[in-house]
Amino acid sequence: AGGRFSLTTLKWNDLSLGAVSGRVRQQARGADFAATHQSALLPGARLAVDGHVALATGETIPRVSLAYRLERAASREDIDLGALKADWAGIRGNGRITAAGRGVYEPGSLQADLRMEISGGRLTIPQKKAGILGFEGAVVFPDLTTLRSAPRQQIAFERTYVGDLAASDGRIEPGGVFFLEQGRFQWCQGTVYLPATRVMPGKDEYDLTLSCDRLKLAPLLEQIGAARAEGGGTVSGRVPIRIRKGQFQVDSGFLYSSPGEGGTIRLRGTDMLTAGIPPGTPQFNQLELARQALKEYDYDWVKLTLATEPREDLLRLKLQLSGRPTHPLPFI
């Protein structure tokens, strides 16, 4: 003997989970069953369950064995994960998901496992301009009752970003280790590349070398607080960074213009060059001449060196230019 059943809406903790339908067939000492669930929380997800319930002679508690499989194809539109958990509101996700496992319940014990795979995954937080794209991998839970995954598992991703900072080709390793094969972000209308980096929980000391490619000189000088600047020209080079307990230090970085590529730079707000120096002195006159020259200067090449003074917690900048003032200088 057998029969069918269906539930239009299945609820749990005031959440409408979706519809359930299935069939039951009685056996000599139990019953076989099969059911499907169309998720309302995760649109497009379908869960199929097949199982058997048996009651042994002299026992009052049945034994249950079942196999389950979940499938969801990537959808055209991302979904708001706030439907799954209120704290996730504003996080949007997508991707193809498959999961399968088996479970056995016997009097006094419960065993269940799960293997879940995802491909083409994406999670974005539009309000914060952050996301992780193209992630894929498999996670195995040998024992679902403890929700602990098996060791040595990895999830790879194509790209992750926060604002203008982006990294590509990375993976999440066991123990919460975050590995980036390549990182990059746009700065001063150029590109800064980060080396392969492994970020580990509890570690607060890192040494990185940033490779800078064609940063615009004028906005660069402004952003590091050297002076207000206008004009063309780019610089490239390397900037070693030391991170110690959340503090950043620059260790002898240098940036230089490409050979044969000069430009014109106009600096404003250079009064600091002569600040505190008595007017009329030779030192004042030399610096005032340089200040006037930098108001508009045609350079053949430019070089910047940067270094942090640990004791003073200051970034020291040295600017070297080879060229000539665009206009004749006043007599000083």
Residue ranges with predicted function:
Residues 247-249:
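A short beta-turn/strand-edge loop motif at beta-sheet boundaries
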Residues 234-236:
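Short, solvent-exposed loop/turn segments enriched in Ser/Thr/Gly
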Residues 257-263:
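Short edge-strand/loop segments of extracellular domains
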